[in-house]
Amino acid sequence: MAQAVEEWYRQMPIITRSYLTAAVVTTVGCTLEIISPYHLYLNPKLVVQHYEIWRLVTNFLYFRKMDLDFLFHMFFLARYCKLLEENSFRGRTADFFYMLLFGATVLTGIVLIGGMIPYISETFARILFLSNSLTFMMVYVWSKHNPFIHMSFLGLFTFTAAYLPWVLLGFSILVGSSTWVDLLGMIAGHVYYFLEDVYPRMTGRRPLKTPSFIKALFADDNVVVARPPNAGLGAGARFGAMGADPQAQ
C-alpha cells in the first residue's frame, strides 16, 4: 500500500506534486499546532501595513482542519490539477504555473476590491482563505477544455463536464455551504478561459502570454507526461461519488 502511494505521488507532474505537498504540509502543521492559521490567512491590513507578504501565498495553502472534507479536497486538488497539467498544459509547465498565478491574483483582487464596497464588504471580509476557490477555478477551466465528457452525480443523474461547476455549486447550496467560494473560483476560471482561449480566437491576440522570466524557471522541464488511459474518469468531488462515463471517451 505504501509503495503504491509513493509511486502515485512520484508520477505526479511537478506543479501538482508541489502544490499538493505544500497544502498537506501546511494543513498538517496547523493541525499539530506547529504553525497557526492566524499567521496564514489573507489580511490586507497586515500585508500592507506590516509587510506580511507571505499571506498572499499561504492563504492558498491551508484547507482547514484535517477531516473527511479535507481528504475530499485533496483528492479534488490532485485530480484536476493533474488532469490539467498532463493534458491541457502538456509540455507547458510554465504556462500552467502562470495560470495558477493569474488565478490567485484575480481571486485576491476580487476579495480586496469587494472588501471596499459597501453592503458586501462584510461578506468579503469573512473570506480568509482562497485555497478552495483556486481549486474550483481549476475545475472550471478543466470543464471548459473537456465539455463533452459524460459524468454522473451519485448515480442519480448524468451530465456533461461542461456543467460540472454548476453541479458542484448546486451541491454546495444543497448542503448549506457558502457559495461564495465556488462563485469566486468560477469567476476567476472564466476570466482566464476567456482571455486565454476565447479572446485570442476572436482577435488573434493573446493577452495572457506567459512572461519570459517565468518560462526561464521551467527551461529545463522537457518531460512530457503521457495521458493515462482513464484520464477522464471520475470527478471525485467533495462528496467523492461522481464519475465519468467511459463510453464517452
UniProtKB/Swiss-Prot annotation:
An example molecular function term from Gene Ontology annotations: signal recognition particle binding
One GO term describing the cellular component: endoplasmic reticulum membrane
Main localization of the protein described in the UniProt heading: endoplasmic reticulum
UniProt xrefs under Pfam families: DER1
UniProt subcellular location: Endoplasmic reticulum membrane
GO biological process, one term: endoplasmic reticulum unfolded protein response
Keyword NAD included in the entry's annotation: no
Protein name stated in the entry: Derlin-2
UniProt topological domain (Cytoplasmic) ranges: 1-21, 118-122, 174-249
Superkingdom of the organism of origin: Eukaryota
Gene designation per UniProt: DER2
Membrane side Lumenal: residue ranges: 43-96, 144-152
Purpose: May be involved in the degradation process of specific misfolded endoplasmic reticulum (ER) luminal proteins.
PANTHER family found in the cross-reference section: DER1-LIKE PROTEIN, DERLIN
UniProt topology in membrane: Multi-pass membrane protein
Transmembrane segments: 22-42, 97-117, 123-143, 153-173
Keywords in alphabetical order: Endoplasmic reticulum, Membrane, Transmembrane, Transmembrane helix
The family this protein is said to belong to: Belongs to the derlin family.
